[in-house]
Amino acid sequence: MASITIRGVKKNYAKTQVVHGVDLDFASGEFVVILGPSGCGKSTLLRMIAGLEEISDGEISIDGTVVNKLEPRERGCAMVFQNYALYPHMSVAQNIGYSLKVAGVPSAERTQRIQAVARTLELEHLLDRKPMALSGGQRQRVAMGRAMIREPKVFLFDEPLSNLDAKLRVQMRSEIRKLHRRLNATSVFVTHDQVEAMTLADRLVVMNGGRVEQVGTPGEIYTRPASRFVATFVGAPAMNILEGTVELDGLSLLGGSRRLAMARTGLPVGTKVAMGIRPEAVRLVAPGIAGALNATVDLVEELGAGRVIYVDLDGAPFSVMTSEAVHPEPGSQVGLKISPDDMHFFSSEAGSRLDVFKASVPEPAL
C-alpha cells in the first residue's frame, strides 16, 4: 500500500495544455475512481502517475517519494489496460508470470506465486490455455493477475471494463471490488462510466476539460454536486436544469413562463440562476394541481422496476423517474410537483454551486 500526492501537475502537448494544475491526495489503501468524459485528461493523469507520460510541470509522489524522474518499473505501480495486453502465444500461466521471469525469479518461486494468484482470481483451471480460448472476462482477470503477481504498491486501471458486455461488466465490477478488499492495495481507476465509478469508488474525482471539478464520496458527489457539469454528468437520467431568476417570494423559470413559490433563497432579487432537480425527486400529480408545473408527455421508457417519463416544459426537455404505477400516454398532460428542499442552484454564468436557504411557501388548505 502507498499514498499518492499530486501537486500542481500539468501536461502540455506543444502549446496545448491538456491537464491544468491538478492537486490531489490519495490515501494508502484507498480505491479512487477518476471519472469524466472522453478527452477530459483522466487517462493522461493516470499515465503520468504510471510514468508512461512525462509531467510538464508539478510533482507526483508515491509513498513520500517524488517519482517525476523515475522509470515506470521503479515506481511500484502495476497497470491494467482496456485491451488486456496479453501475449497471444503464451499460456495464462506464462502471461501471469512473465514479469517474474524477466526479473530472474527462480522457476519454483514463479510457479508458487502464479498458483497463488490463480487461486485468488479463480483461474486455476485455465492456466494452460492461450488467451484466444478465453472469454473477455477471463482475459481481464488474467490481465489483473499479471498486475497482482508483481505485488505493487499501487494498482492503476485504465478503463479495464470498456470492452466487456453489460453482464460481464457487472460481474467484473464485483470481482474488482472484492479483490481490493482482500488486497487492501491503493487503487486508481479511470472510467467514463458513472455506474462503474459510483459502485467501485471510496472517493470520486470528477474531471472536465483537464481540471478537477469535484472530489468526494459517491454520495457527496450525487447529493451535493459542486458544479452544473457534475450535476448533469453524474446521474442517469441526468439532473434536470431550468434557467430562472430569483424573485422576492419565488423563482421565475423559463423566461417568466413558469413560477415556483419559495419563501426566500438568500440571493438578491434578479439573480440569474440554473435550478437543478433530480428526476427521482419530481412527483407526478394531476395537471392543474396548485403549485405544480403542467407539462406535456413526450416519451415513456419502461425499466421494469419503474419508468422514466420525458416531458416538454414550454420547450424545455425534462425527465421524471418513478416506480409508481402511472402510465401516462404521449401527448397527455401531467403535473410536476417539486419541493424546494430537493432543488440545487448553480450560477448561470460560472456554473458553480450556490448554497442557498430554501423554504417552501405553504400550500393553501383545500
Swiss-Prot record:
Ranges of residues in domain ABC transporter: 4-234
Subcellular location: Cell inner membrane
Catalyzed reactions: sn-glycerol 3-phosphate(out) + ATP + H2O = sn-glycerol 3-phosphate(in) + ADP + phosphate + H(+)
GO biological process annotation, one example: carbohydrate transport
Pfam families per record: ABC_tran (PF00005), TOBE_2 (PF08402)
EC number: 7.6.2.10
Residue numbers binding ATP: 36-43
Top EC category: translocase
Family (UniProt): Belongs to the ABC transporter superfamily. sn-glycerol-3-phosphate importer (TC 3.A.1.1.3) family.
Function noted in UniProt: Part of the ABC transporter complex UgpBAEC involved in sn-glycerol-3-phosphate (G3P) import. Responsible for energy coupling to the transport system.
Protein name as annotated: sn-glycerol-3-phosphate import ATP-binding protein UgpC
Organism: Mesorhizobium japonicum (strain LMG 29417 / CECT 9101 / MAFF 303099)
Source lineage: Bacteria, Pseudomonadati, Pseudomonadota, Alphaproteobacteria, Hyphomicrobiales
Annotated gene: ugpC
